[in-house]
């Protein structure tokens, strides 16, 4: 089990709890590395990180919306590259019903609040389908908006998908 974060403070916190978390979940192979989610071939220290097809389950909790739209293509390609045949995705993130305008995208408070980078709902699912994932579904989609800005509804949703094994 490998956790990734680019923030050294978060990594320090994660590593301080690593032993107790590993014993609670019953796995001894828990580690954390400093990396960018859209550059998984090596970590931020220049060390090799993830080979092609080496991850059985990709879990992400409110991270994809923090990636700039200009880097989303690379992000998606990296998720696809590291997912093993037969692998699965479980991604919880923020989606919206209308495109986020530039003025909201440029607001640092809304970026840190997971609003500015929200994925358009239809694009969120289709992006993974276009990569070859199957059974792509939004599950546990929040019916009522979490927040509304400029008439745009923002809500949480969980996406699940599978990569065919053959």
What spans do the regions from the language model cover?
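Class I SAM-dependent methyltransferase SAM/SAH-binding core
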Residues: 1-47
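A short glycine-rich, Lys/Arg-flanked "PGG" loop and its adjoining helix->strand segment in the class I
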Residues: 72-88
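C-terminal lobe and adjacent flexible extensions of AdoMet/dcAdoMet transferase-like proteins
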Residues: 131-166
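Short "lid" loop at the C-terminus of a central beta-strand within the Rossmann-like core
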Residues: 38-39, 64, 94-99, 142-145
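Short, glycine-/aromatic-enriched active-site segment of Class I SAM-dependent methyltransferases
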Residues: 95-115
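Class I S-adenosylmethionine-dependent transferase superfamily signal
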Residues: 62, 78-80, 128
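Short alpha-helix
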Residues: 116-132
